[in-house]
From Swiss-Prot:
InterPro entries linked: Dehydroquinate_synthase, DHQ_synth_AroB, DHQ_synth_fam, DHQS/DOIS_N, DHQS_C
Catalysis performed (reactions): 7-phospho-2-dehydro-3-deoxy-D-arabino-heptonate = 3-dehydroquinate + phosphate
NCBIfam families on file: aroB
Protein name as annotated: 3-dehydroquinate synthase
Keywords from the named record: Amino-acid biosynthesis, Aromatic amino acid biosynthesis, Cobalt, Cytoplasm, Lyase, Metal-binding, NAD, Nucleotide-binding, Zinc
Positions annotated to bind NAD(+): 70-75, 104-108, 128-129, 141, 150
The organism's place on the tree of life at top rank: Bacteria
EC number(s) per entry: 4.2.3.4
Amino acid sequence: MQTLHVELGERRYPIFIGSQLDPKQLLEPYIHGQQVMIVSNVTVAPLYLSHYQEALESLGKTVATCILPDGEKYKDIQHLNLIFDALLEAGFNRDCTVLALGGGVIGDMAGFASACFQRGVYFVQVPTTLLSQVDSSVGGKTGINHPLGKNMLGAFQQPQVVLADMAQLNTLPERELSAGLAEVIKYALLGDEDFLVWLEENMDGLVARDADLLAEAVYRSCAHKARIVANDEKEQGERALLNLGHTFGHAIESYLGYGTWLHGEAVATGMVMAADLSQRLGWISNEDVARTKKIIQRANLPISCPQIPLDDFLGYMAHDKKVLNGQLRLVLLKQLGQAVITKNFDVELMKQAILANQHG
């Protein structure tokens, strides 16, 4: 087992990464009250819920559960209310813990519920997908979608602890595994060319679910995110770099309908668009764009999206949270392994990059 820490002063917390982790031993120091609400979904609960429920009950905790439907399209205010209903019906109080057992949707919703319930209760992350292990479970961003934009309602709510168990990735559908690899590739492109080389050498093993390689990829990804979050928790500066590919990707997700494409699939094509625009601006070479596309394709991810009317695409981009004083800011590549956030780009070139990476 490997351990990382997100350094946030008094709110410092560990990320435990390994295979067949012992929840009783690892969770005991971080469950402060007697009441635990496990939030999961209909896919994950039959696989792992009893394991965590029994571990917590053996610690003398009162455990209740809230099982939600599975999918991004349920990340809305109606289903968030189901978590509040469960907490209130169980009679839970301000020293309870909300434990997220699932992927990014469950983590986002359970975290947001924990931030809101009685103005804030304890929160624990047990991410069961690769995407949530390397990205959404670390850093405290929580929230739900609104019909007009993704993640428009939310709060920063740091967990007490994160448990990333590689064994849980064995039950992950191939498409979900690939979606997680998109976020892994993102870390390499935005800040670590050595990691990109490592991914190029080991992508076949990652796709084949080699546990040691997956653990290394999760560790390196989380180390990048932990460092950035420690420096910029509320996304005032450097943390925005973690949105490489996301402004384009969120537009794709929003237009196609939440859940039609997985988040990681949209981010993958979004990173291709960002690389394409970076090349059009003269910052990276055609070879760099080709290299970006190749590693994304080797992870079984899309490098283009279905045709989306340009006005619709731009309309969704205008709702992006990185818009500042009415100006869209994008995360682009100065070179592979070095990203910048900028408002200094030619909008016509951006339109060309969007249109060039769509298919009929």
